[in-house]
């Protein structure tokens, strides 16, 4: 019998992920299963609106970035080894391009990642889950 590896991402990506470039901003390795993602506007609040996809599934739909975070949490425990998070600009706000700060909290570690997206380019983060043995 042959082993079939589970696909990292769901089989059919939405058009917004295939018709724009998905620019890899950062790759993070995590041994902790609990991941928390918070998204804020970077700088001036200018009505930037984003969507966030986790392995091709929309998890934040047309969220408006401001000083209060848009929050998404997930557990890597039973899921794919690689977790692809893609930030999509739904508009450019009043001051293009669409800019965001993504704060990724893994265990006690916190990382701030600066993201830029527009109508041609999405921002991608990959979190590789590698549990301690």
Regions found by a protein language model. Give the residues of each.
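Terminal leader/tail segments of proteins
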Residues: 1-133
């Amino acid at each position: 019998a042959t082993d079939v590896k589970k696909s990292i991402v769901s089989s059919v990506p939405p058009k917004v992920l295939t018709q724009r470039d998905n620019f890899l901003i950062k790759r993070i390795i995590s041994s902790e299963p609990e991941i928390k993602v918070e998204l804020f506007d970077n700088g001036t609040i200018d009505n930037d609106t984003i969507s966030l996809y986790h392995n091709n599934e929309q998890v934040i739909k047309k969220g408006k970035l401001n000083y209060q975070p848009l929050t998404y949490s997930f557990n890597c425990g039973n899921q794919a080894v690689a977790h692809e998070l893609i930030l999509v600009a739904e508009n450019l706000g009043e001051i293009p391009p669409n800019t965001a700060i993504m704060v990724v909290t893994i265990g006690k570690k916190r990382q701030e990642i600066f993201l830029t997206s527009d109508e041609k380019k999405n921002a991608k983060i990959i979190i590789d889950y590698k549990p301690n043995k």
